[in-house]
Curated annotation (Swiss-Prot):
Gene Ontology BP annotations: riboflavin biosynthetic process
Protein's name according to its UniProt entry: 6,7-dimethyl-8-ribityllumazine synthase
Residues holding 5-amino-6-(D-ribitylamino)uracil: F22, A56, W57, E58, A80, V81, I82, L113
Transferase found in the keyword field: yes
Enzyme Commission numbers on file: 2.5.1.78
Pathway: Cofactor biosynthesis; riboflavin biosynthesis; riboflavin from 2-hydroxy-3-oxobutyl phosphate and 5-amino-6-(D-ribitylamino)uracil: step 1/2
Source organism of this protein record: Gemmatimonas aurantiaca (strain DSM 14586 / JCM 11422 / NBRC 100505 / T-27)
Amino acid sequence: MAEFSGEPRGEGRRIVVVASRFNEGVTVPLAEGAVSALVGKGVAFDNIDVLWVPGAWELPVAVRRALSSERYDAAVAVGAVIRGDTPHFDIVAGETARGLMEASRDFDVPVTLGLLTTDTLEQAEARAGGVHGNKGADAALAALEVLDLFDRALPANDYDEDGE
């Protein structure tokens, strides 16, 4: 049996961080945490782009557009959806996560989820550089780890259109 895992190595990588402006008191630290983690693992600062979108709902379409450019090795999506008194939370959180997963699947590129879905602002702040760490940084490190795993164990196939 063979076992493989990746390490969060950033040298030579080009990463896009797509961040939601809504709840910016939380999302700015998430985006900053992602960028800091990427640079800390060797991604050149000039190889990181940060795209700001209005809200979490717009994260999937922006990630798809970024990946369609073929400029990026991975995407890190960060945002915060905080529960209110209506079912809006469930729709936005679920469909945003689904859209990001579909982008990853469709483009065969890691898209990591730094989307906080919390009941309160305090819970979100605790996960955006507070007592529970920075989930933007965690998502960035996960992207690098998956890329390294792919390099080590799951290289892309160079098939022609006939699958040969």
